[in-house]
């Protein structure tokens, strides 16, 4: 018999109508803004699966825009997120797409465009009960759920990186909730994802994110 928590049975506190289509969507967009650079001038929401079919009726569209604006799922401002985005000068568009069978039906690819013509994107999936997971960042397959503060690092395959990061964290009395690596066999680039039990101090941010060996170093605080 499977045990369920009260949260899983009752769902999160949120602006409705659907925990999957609004709360999860809002969280995806909110976390995505912590991953990319912050000087984007347009956001495109590419909706996949059931998101693509029901995004207007279920409020997914307003929840996504609200998440980009930094709102939490229980923030009443989600109801007026379109109007607030206009006031903030945020340009956004919605399109539908097929990301493929490997993606959860409630998935969205959020593309951030910058004044210099460059783009970044984040793919996230709403997996029920207001929970979500980020599954791809700029073509790198990863998985984290935004439940813990998370360090994201990319680097050419080499020894000592994991021990360097983990020793810094444990030496500063951090608990590592999860640590995962994925390697691109074509480029030998490794993606390291580390979830920790509390936010990084400024000194640890510098010690970890400021190291030259990392081609990408990002931090998402929860």
UniProtKB/Swiss-Prot annotation:
It catalyses: L-serine = pyruvate + NH4(+). Binds 1 [4Fe-4S] cluster. It is an enzyme of class 4 (lyase). One of its GO terms (molecular function) is L-serine ammonia-lyase activity. Pfam families: SDH_beta. Keywords: 4Fe-4S, Gluconeogenesis, Iron, Iron-sulfur, Lyase, Metal-binding. One of its GO terms (biological process) is gluconeogenesis. Its EC number is 4.3.1.17. InterPro entries: ACT-like_dom_sf (IPR045865), ACT_dom (IPR002912), ASB_dom_sf (IPR029009), Fe-S_L-Ser (IPR051318), Fe-S_L-Ser_bsu (IPR004643), Ser_deHydtase_bsu (IPR005131). It comes from the Bacteria. Residues 150-222 form the ACT domain. Its cofactor is [4Fe-4S] cluster. Pathway: Carbohydrate biosynthesis; gluconeogenesis. Heterooctamer of four alpha chains and four beta chains. Belongs to the iron-sulfur dependent L-serine dehydratase family. This is L-serine dehydratase, beta chain. It comes from Peptoniphilus asaccharolyticus. The gene is sdhB.
């Amino acid at each position: 018999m499977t045990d369920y928590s009260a949260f899983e049975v009752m769902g999160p506190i949120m602006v409705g109508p659907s925990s999957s289509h609004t709360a999860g969507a809002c969280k995806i967009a909110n976390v995505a803004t912590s991953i990319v650079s912050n000087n984007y001038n347009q956001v495109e929401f590419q909706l996949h699966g059931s998101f693509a079919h029901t995004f207007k009726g279920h409020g997914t569209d307003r929840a996504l825009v609200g998440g980009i604006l930094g709102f939490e799922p229980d923030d009443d401002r989600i109801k007026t997120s379109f109007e607030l985005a206009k006031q903030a000068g945020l340009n956004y568009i919605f399109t539908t797409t097929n990301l493929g069978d490997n993606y959860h039906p409630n998935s969205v690819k959020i593309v951030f465009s910058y004044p210099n013509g460059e783009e970044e994107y984040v793919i996230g999936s709403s997996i029920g009960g207001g929970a979500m997971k980020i599954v791809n960042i700029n073509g790198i397959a990863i998985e984290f759920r935004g439940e813990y503060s998370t360090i994201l690092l990319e680097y050419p395959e080499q020894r000592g990186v994991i021990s360097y990061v983990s020793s810094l964290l444990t030496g500063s009395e951090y608990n590592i909730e999860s640590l995962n690596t994925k390697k691109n066999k074509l480029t030998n680039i490794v993606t390291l994802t580390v979830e920790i039990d509390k936010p990084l101090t400024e000194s640890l941010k510098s010690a970890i994110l400021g190291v030259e060996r990392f081609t990408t170093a990002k931090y998402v605080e929860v």
